[in-house]
Amino acid sequence: MAANAAGPASRYDVTLDQSDAELVEEIAWKLATQATGRPDDAEWVEAARNAWHAWPATLRRDLAGFRRDSGPDGAIVLRGLPVDSMGLPPTPRVNGSVQREASLGAAVLLMTACGLGDPGAFLPEKNGALVQDVVPVPGMEEFQGNAGSTLLTFHNENAFHEHRPDFVMLLCLRADPTGRAGLRTACVRRVLPLLSDSTVDALWAPEFRTAPPPSFQLSGPEEAPAPVLLGDRSDPDLRVDLAATEPVTERAAEALRELQAHFDATAVTHRLLPGELAIVDNRVTVHGRTEFTPRYDGTDRWLQRTFVLTDLRRSRAMRPADGYVLGAAPQPA
C-alpha cells in the first residue's frame, strides 16, 4: 500500500504512469480552456463527457471495473492526476465556497464523473454547484461537515435522501501542511462478517430515523423509521449517518454502537496528496475525516468534491429542465 494510507490494504490503488498522466493533463487543459460556458452548464458537462472517451484505455477500464464492483473496501484512489498545484490561489476560507469557473480540477472531476455516470448536486447544498470546495472555515471547527476540522463521524453522503449520490469523489488540490488531515472510509463488506447476529437483525429492521440538515428545509410529515441495511442480505447497501441517524428502539441503539466500533476498527485512512482522487462508493461505504488543526493562512488542506449518480433518470422529478441539480422537493406536474 502507498505510504500515505493507513489501515487494511485496498486492491484499488491506481498510479498513472508518465504517459497516461501527460495525456490526461493535455485533455483536461483543453477542456478547461476551450469548452463553452462554465462547469455547471450542460454544454460544459457534455464537453467533459466527450473528453472522457479520450482518456487512456487502461484508466477507463479500471474505473469501469470499479463502477461494476467497488471491492471489499468500496473505494479507489487514483494518483498522478493534474491539478496545477503551482498555479493555485490561497485555500478559500469562506463557508460554501465552490468552483464555478473552468479549472484543471473541475475538468478532471467532471470527466471522471461522466465516466462513472453523471455528475449531480443538490440545490440546498452549496447552491447546487457541481464542483464544491472542501476546506476548513474559521469559526466552524466543531461543525460536523466539510467546513469543520474536528473528527468527522462516519456517514453515507446525504443518507437521508432518496437520491443520495452513488459515488463521492474528492480530489486533493493542496494537502494538509501538518499531515494530520485524512479521509477515513469503512465498508459494510468488511464490517458485516464481524457483527453479532442480533446487531445484523436490528440493522435490517425499520428502527432508525436519519434527519436531513437544516439547509434542505424539507416539509411534510416526519420520515417513517427505516433500516440501516438494504438490498441483498449477503451484500447489502448501507444508509447511515452516525451524527444524524437516531435509533427508535434500545436494540437499534446498541446496534449503532456496535456498528460504529467496527467502522473504527476496519477504517482505512487516506492522507491525500495533490493530484490524488479518492472515489467512495456511497452505497456500501461510509466516510469521515480525522481531526486536524487549520492554520487559516492560505496553505490549508483543499479538496474539491463532485457527486456521481449512476441512474440520473430516477431523480428526474427533482431536476428542473432535466439538469444535473436536484431541488429540495419534486417538481409540480
Curated annotation (Swiss-Prot):
Q: What CDD domains does the record tag this protein with?
A: CAS_like
Species of origin reads Streptomyces coelicolor (strain ATCC BAA-471 / A3(2) / M145)
Q: Which family does it belong to?
A: Belongs to the clavaminate synthase family.
Q: What is its EC number?
A: 1.14.11.39
- Return the SUPFAM superfamilies for the record: Clavaminate synthase-like (SSF51197)
Which residues does the record give as 2-oxoglutarate binding sites? Answer: 301
Q: Where does L-asparagine bind?
A: 125, 146, 157-158, 305
Cofactor dependence is on:
Fe(2+)
The entry's protein name is L-asparagine oxygenase
- Example GO molecular function: iron ion binding
UniProt-listed PANTHER family: GAMMA-BUTYROBETAINE HYDROXYLASE-RELATED, TAUD_TFDA-LIKE DOMAIN-CONTAINING PROTEIN
Q: Which gene encodes it?
A: asnO
Q: Which GO terms describe its biological process?
A: antibiotic biosynthetic process
Q: Which UniProt keywords apply?
A: Antibiotic biosynthesis, Iron, Metal-binding, Oxidoreductase
InterPro entries in UniProt:
AlphaKG_dependent_hydroxylases, Clavaminate_syn-like, TauD-like_sf, TauD/TfdA-like
Tell me the null mutant phenotype. S.coelicolor strain A3(2) / MT1110 and A3(2) / 2377 lacking asnO produce non-hydroxylated asparagine-containing CDA variants, which are not synthesized by the wild-types but retain calcium-dependent antimicrobial activity.
